[in-house]
């Protein structure tokens, strides 16, 4: 049977815009891209002073279409209000939704980069985002916000360009990737490598390592949720005579990802996450955290097994101008993509108490949102 060729452009909005940069990009670990492209979406208008911009940073397999995957946070009077702000979300370096990555054509060879795409880091992602914002005329970020991988980017923005960022929100993330997360990422990569079509990453577009990438996604989905959420949703219910509903759910999630994502991009992006460490080449980790004095909201999820609450508490303890936010839910890491109304209320509560530019938060007491079924209190 003939395999269909992956068309990643079918999985991001027709409203996506592109910025092309013809100058070489030297990456943190020494690799170079001769040129690069950034896919992005924007909402609202940039003001004359260029300082009403908000940057949204997406997670691992996300796209620039934040108005789709974070839709409840958009609208007048909400976190992302395009009547007041200029909101930007760009696809990260190394992804496959329009920004240069392993699935892109190498202009020097005329072929896909594939596994030869150079190693990159969260800092490289942020540098590419800065290039985009410069091209758009942004002079200062009113806020940078992201969850998971997006939160890593938000923190790096504070460390790399502190004078460019007014406030930041980090959700379900950490200042450095733990051995636990690195191990789980490697298990997923090994699942991809075990696919007979992997071929060291030199697979053809017609025959990608679908089984391996699907298995990787199934592993990941188990870490994005919790035992309690699986028990509540599936328990031991059957889909068919010998198939549990939870098995069917995981198979479906795996199949969905292989239709929309590139395996090499998945490998490279998870490796970039594993390299995440705010203190790399900057000195003592805690001193680095102490140096980040931008007004910050650090949001934890009580049931997150990937980035547990103590990691966010540590950030708040050492960052001198940070406030702690908590989402209570049984959904685990994915809560920030599920309980979005609650997240919107948390961020808005933080925004309402922000001090004048350059000042410290007057109130660092935690902001808490409790979610049980349809009940919500802030």
Curated annotation (Swiss-Prot):
GO biological process: homoserine metabolic process; methionine biosynthetic process
Reactions catalysed: L-homoserine + acetyl-CoA = O-acetyl-L-homoserine + CoA
This protein's record includes keyword Transferase: yes
Name of the molecule in the record: Homoserine O-acetyltransferase
Enzyme class: transferase
Protein localization: Cytoplasm
Domain of life: Bacteria
Entry keyword Cytoplasm: yes
Record text on subunit structure and interactions: Homodimer.
Function: Transfers an acetyl group from acetyl-CoA to L-homoserine, forming acetyl-L-homoserine.
Lineage: Bacteria, Pseudomonadati, Chlorobiota, Chlorobiia, Chlorobiales
Record GO terms (molecular function): homoserine O-acetyltransferase activity
Similarity-based family: Belongs to the AB hydrolase superfamily. MetX family.
Keywords tagged on the record: Acyltransferase, Amino-acid biosynthesis, Cytoplasm, Methionine biosynthesis, Transferase
InterPro entries, alphabetized: AB_hydrolase_1 (IPR000073), AB_hydrolase_fold (IPR029058), HAT_MetX-like (IPR008220)
Residues annotated as the enzyme's active site: 148, 304, 333
PANTHER family: HOMOSERINE O-ACETYLTRANSFERASE
GO cellular component, one term: cytoplasm
SUPFAM superfamilies xref list: alpha/beta-Hydrolases
Pathway entry: Amino-acid biosynthesis; L-methionine biosynthesis via de novo pathway; O-acetyl-L-homoserine from L-homoserine: step 1/1
Residue ranges constituting the AB hydrolase-1 domain according to the UniProt record: 52-337
Broad class of the protein's primary localization: cytoplasm
Binding site for substrate: 217, 334
Record EC number: 2.3.1.31
């Amino acid at each position: 049977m003939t395999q269909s060729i992956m068309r990643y452009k079918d999985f991001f909005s027709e409203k996506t815009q592109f910025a092309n940069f013809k100058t070489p990009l030297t990456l943190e670990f020494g690799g170079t891209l001769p040129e690069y492209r950034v896919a992005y979406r924007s909402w609202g208008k940039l003001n004359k002073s260029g300082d009403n911009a908000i940057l949204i940073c997406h997670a691992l397999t996300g796209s620039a279409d934040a108005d789709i995957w974070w839709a409840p946070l958009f609208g007048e009077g909400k976190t992302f209000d395009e009547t007041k702000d200029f909101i930007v979300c760009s696809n990260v370096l190394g992804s496959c939704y329009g920004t240069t990555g392993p699935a892109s054509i190498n202009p020097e060879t005329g072929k896909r980069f594939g596994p030869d795409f150079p190693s990159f880091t969260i800092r490289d992602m942020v540098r590419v985002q800065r290039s985009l914002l410069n091209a758009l005329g942004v002079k200062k970020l009113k806020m940078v916000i992201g969850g998971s991988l997006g939160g890593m980017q938000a923190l790096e923005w504070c460390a790399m360009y502190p004078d460019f960022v007014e406030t930041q929100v980090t959700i379900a993330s950490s200042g450095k990737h733990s051995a636990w997360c690195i191990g789980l990422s490697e298990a997923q990569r090994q699942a991809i490598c075990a696919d007979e079509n992997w071929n060291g990453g030199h697979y053809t577009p017609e025959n990608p390592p679908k089984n391996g990438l699907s298995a990787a996604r199934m592993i990941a989905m188990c870490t994005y949720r919790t035992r309690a959420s699986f028990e509540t949703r599936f328990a031991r219910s059957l889909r068919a005579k010998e198939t549990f509903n939870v098995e069917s759910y995981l198979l479906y999630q795996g199949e969905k990802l292989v239709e929309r994502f590139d395996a090499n991009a998945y490998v490279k992006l998870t490796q970039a996450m594993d390299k995440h460490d705010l203190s790399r080449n900057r000195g003592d980790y805690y001193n680095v955290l102490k140096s980040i004095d931008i007004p910050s909201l650090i949001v934890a999820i009580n049931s997150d097994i990937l980035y547990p609450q103590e990691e966010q508490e540590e950030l708040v303890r050492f960052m001198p101008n940070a406030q702690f936010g908590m989402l209570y839910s049984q959904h685990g890491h994915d809560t920030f993509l599920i309980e979005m109304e609650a997240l919107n209320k948390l961020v808005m509560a933080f925004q309402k108490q922000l001090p004048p530019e350059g000042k410290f938060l007057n109130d660092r007491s935690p902001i808490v949102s409790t979610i049980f079924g349809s009940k919500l209190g802030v």
